Amino acid sequence: MTVSSGDPDVHASRSAQLFERADLVIPGGVNSPVRAFHSVGGTPRFIREASGYTLTDVDGNDYVDLICSWGPMILGHAHPAVVEAVQTAATTGLSFGAPTEGEIELAEEIVRRVAPVEKVRLVNSGTEATMSAVRLARGFTGRTKVLKFSGCYHGHVDALLADAGSGLATFGLPTSPGVTGAQAEDTIVVPYNDLDAVAAAFAANEGQIACVITEAAAGNMGAVAPQPGFNEGLRTLTRDNGALLIMDEVMTGFRVSSAGWYGLDGVAGDLYTFGKVMSGGLPAAAFGGRADVMAHLAPAGPVYQAGTLSGNPVAVAAGLASLRAADQGVYDALERNSATLRTLLSDALTAASVPHRVQTAGTMLSVFFSEDPVTNYEEAKAAQTWRFPAFFHGLLSRGVYPPPSAFEAWFVSAAMDDTAFSIIADALPSAAKAAAAAVQP
């Protein structure tokens, strides 16, 4: 059954029951906050299965998926090559706690694709990757302070939750309770796309900043690309001040090109973090970079990092299969599909006289209800975000599943076809009208 009603929850009775049940044993009923529909209201959809571009919930509703598991599913769901790789790996053992050849192959694939990355360490999540990269940067430089950007999200690492995007943006929190003052004191936060602020921070903290960490292109305040020269400027400022540049490509890595954002702008970081696409949809991530920096990582060096399930053979098999299947044809399809979605969104919102900007960062995109370009977090928050819940439910109730937050990027998959875009095109006029009719609280 495909959703066709304008009522956001009319066909969600089983999801509602499961959400109530989940809330009894899981905080907030979900295992990652944005899934709770906190900023859009209504009942979170509990998913039964997925194939290609289609999600099917427990009530039997089908949706064109524009979340793609928050980025990993560039091939679409249940891609045969990935499923076969997982099944084959699982028959030989689920976890060994010892090295495997697959770990080497996955690391080699990452090194082959991203030239500045000379060595790689596999971990289980993007949060682990960024946490470990920052620790390594501190150990390598002997410095303590970290510079990050307002609205950029680097996982739920204590030191990096200050003024973050993603889930914290959804909840309107500048940071999280439980993050100590001492941790916050070592984190310097400046506006995204503002090189003058970065230069001023270095001047005010001379010899103290271990690293600058940035999303290679921001996706957790919505899709906000670096302005021309911004990443290049970060490279110059970090090099001139003896700090490392950490490029967080958990979101952009292997999605916006076969070499991630590095493949688009060619700016070489000292360290990189990866996740999502390289995981094939299973829990896996990585960090890597210059060989001389990575040489400080245990057991080769003194900076400790470890993980029981790091390099898990089933996750490694999924990631390797996903990367190997992502040939140029896949990236061409992602470009086409992103461009088509962008046009459909803008045409529908223009027809409904809704102020908007459909912004892209590579093949990621976001809808901002603003007439002005969004280049940083403050501008993202200044948009008419109160229009988003009506727009979201206008799409969801008609078989299209966008991210349930105005501050998250939208993702396409290579599996999307004319039928998928026909469903989107049919859903958009009423959703755009709902956004136009929304009333500011």
UniProtKB/Swiss-Prot annotation:
Keywords (A to Z) from UniProt: Cytoplasm, Isomerase, Porphyrin biosynthesis, Pyridoxal phosphate
Enzyme class: isomerase
Residues the record lists as N6-(pyridoxal phosphate)lysine modifications: K276
Cofactor(s), by name: pyridoxal 5'-phosphate
Annotated localization: Cytoplasm
Pfam family membership, one: Aminotran_3
Single GO term (MF): pyridoxal phosphate binding
Catalytically driven reaction(s): (S)-4-amino-5-oxopentanoate = 5-aminolevulinate
Claim: Isomerase is one of the keywords in the record: yes
Family membership noted in the UniProt record: Belongs to the class-III pyridoxal-phosphate-dependent aminotransferase family. HemL subfamily.
Subunit composition and interactions: Homodimer.
Protein name: Glutamate-1-semialdehyde 2,1-aminomutase
Protein species of origin: Rhodococcus opacus (strain B4)
Gene that encodes the chain: hemL
